[in-house]
Amino acid sequence: YVAEFFDVVARLNTILVDYARDTWSYISIGYFRQHQVAGEIGSSTMPHKVNPIDFENAEGNFGVANALMQHLGAKLPISRWQRDLTDSTVLRNVGSAIGYTLIALNSLERGIGKLQPDNDAQLADLRNAWEVLAEPIQTVMRRYGIENSYEALKDLTRGQRMDRESLHRFLDTLTLPGAELQRLKALTPESYLGLAEKLASEI
């Protein structure tokens, strides 16, 4: 059960490493800002920087913890002829493995406490992402029996930056009821949610 415990904690740590990296990335592209802490140094050469140091520390300490925990999980079920003493050597590192995990959790909590969403930056990206409307358009096209609906939207939008005009030009080529066409033209990247709200409420 001790080995199983370390395997489970290592998996949880891995999930949190993924979270720390994602949050670091969102900070880097401006989706989140961090509250400044008086006296904190973000960079040794760039005084203006507010680095995501807590998320970097969390990632590093989760990594060290997992290196120990994965070894504990793999080593403890094995005993040479059921009598060797390597377990006692390895078990001396239990405290370190748990300690690094706790340090990482504290860093993560501290970092989360500094986060503030930058709604303007997020909305700016969303408002320019007209290609997300390919989903409702191809769904309506299928409903009205238009062949190769998915493929048509894929050819139009995949790897492309769309805008309102280019999307509306495509809509004008479709044989759809007028009311349906106007409903699609009224959609914007900001207003279209699809099933996002329903799926989020089910988490």
Which residues does each PLM region occupy?
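Glycine-rich cofactor/substrate-binding loops
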Residues: 30-31, 43-203
